[in-house]
Amino acid sequence: PDARRHRAFLVPIGGLELGIACGALFVHEKRYYKDLLNQQPATAWREQPILPMAVLTQNDRTAAMRQSGVTEEGPAGVLVGAGSLGSALLNLWGRSGWGRWTVIDKDHIKPHNLSRHGAYAQHIGETKATVVAGLHAAAMEGATEIVPVVADGCDFAQADVAQALAGAALAIDASTTLEYPRAASVVDTLPRHFSVFVTPNGNAAVLLAEDAKRMQRLRTLEAQYYRALIQQDWGRVHLDGHASTFWSGASCRDISLVMPYSRILGQASTLAEQIQAAVAREDALIRIWQRDPARGGVEVHDVPAVPERRIALGELDLYIDDGVEQQLRVLRQQSFPNETGGVLLGYYDFNIKAVVIVAGLPAPSDSKASPDSFERGVAGLAEAVKDAAKRTAGMVGYVGEWHSHPPGHSASPSRHDLVQLVHLALGMADDGLPAVQLIVGEQDLQILQGAVQ
């Protein structure tokens, strides 16, 4: 048949009494018997009302998808982080039937979590992953399930974590820390990764999405996001509120601070739909939604994602993307015929043994430049570095120096360049960090590292 429909009717009388009314039964000394001898048709049953009833069925995945307007089943996915944002995302996707999810989190529900989490007071002390899976089961009654893994998502050697990631087509980082996305970026065997977070005051949401082939990983997307914060006007207030915590946070993505749950749910709703759209894309994506809390309006900022390159520097790997090189080449060309230069902004992460270049600052106004030399000045430099740190919640700072060589010359370091590198290394040694020197030539780019042993 093309379709099958169910109908139900209610007769408001017990089954035995209905049998008597139909002439099928009779009662004797409070016991019911079949009436085999009665030949008279019974009519008492006609006095009973027959009421039509609606036939309802429990939702399965198909019904949930149809009711939610979801046309694609979604990927086999892993979500790392069952906190405020992660639990909201899973609730939205789970009820709409999108995706087949495993959630990884080692943390427990604490009393203060209840102001911005789907958990209830009865869940205090239970693991977040288990609670989220249980809440999903309560809503879906077995139509779909979320598999909880109580573990550290960064422990890729842990059997349950490794198995979950091996069976996934997509992993979404909602951990609110930097440790997981940076660690995942150096593992080639992992599936495509997205990272999502809400800014500390809840007024913005960020989606970083790797391309389908993982040529542009979360590591470089993070750096390019920071560069946009430093260079774009909207970056001035984007991370405001990161110092207003009541709980010590681990990064600019920590949301353990004073904020209404409504902001989490609003941003989660946007991210849930946008992630579904991003999964269908092959390219990388950096997208920011900035909300005006006074009027509720939202501005969307797209940052073009560009490739990165890795340069081995002894014990550290240096990562720099095409956007940095393009920026420095523009500054070089604008200064012709003179050389130019400035400071390099970025960050070190010794957990993954990396230094990441985010941007270069232009030459201070009191710099001295000629066609064959450059001496960087200091006017406004401290303020510029401080502003970059403020815009990125302290994530980006000074990592070294860059300068250009004149037209027609390569980036090969001169004797003077090597002397400068020694001075840089001695200066950075006070902080226990190596120094980076970047030289921009006509066609090439040289990066040198100096460290005091």
Predicted features along the sequence, with ranges:
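Glycine-rich phosphate-binding loop and adjoining beta1-alpha1-beta2 segment
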Residues: 106-144
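Adenosine-phosphate binding glycine-rich loop
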Residues: 198-294
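Glycine/serine-rich phosphate-binding loop and adjoining beta1-alpha1 elements at the start
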Residues: 1-75
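Conserved beta-strand-loop surface patch within small alpha/beta domains used
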Residues: 300-400, 406-453
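A structured beta-alpha segment of the ubiquitous adenosine-cofactor-binding alpha/beta core
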Residues: 133-169, 175-178
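Phosphate-binding loop/pocket of nucleotide- and phosphate-handling active sites
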Residues: 37-58, 278-334
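Glycine-rich adenosine-cofactor-binding loop
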Residues: 66-108
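ADP-ribose/adenylate-binding Rossmann-like module
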Residues: 170-211
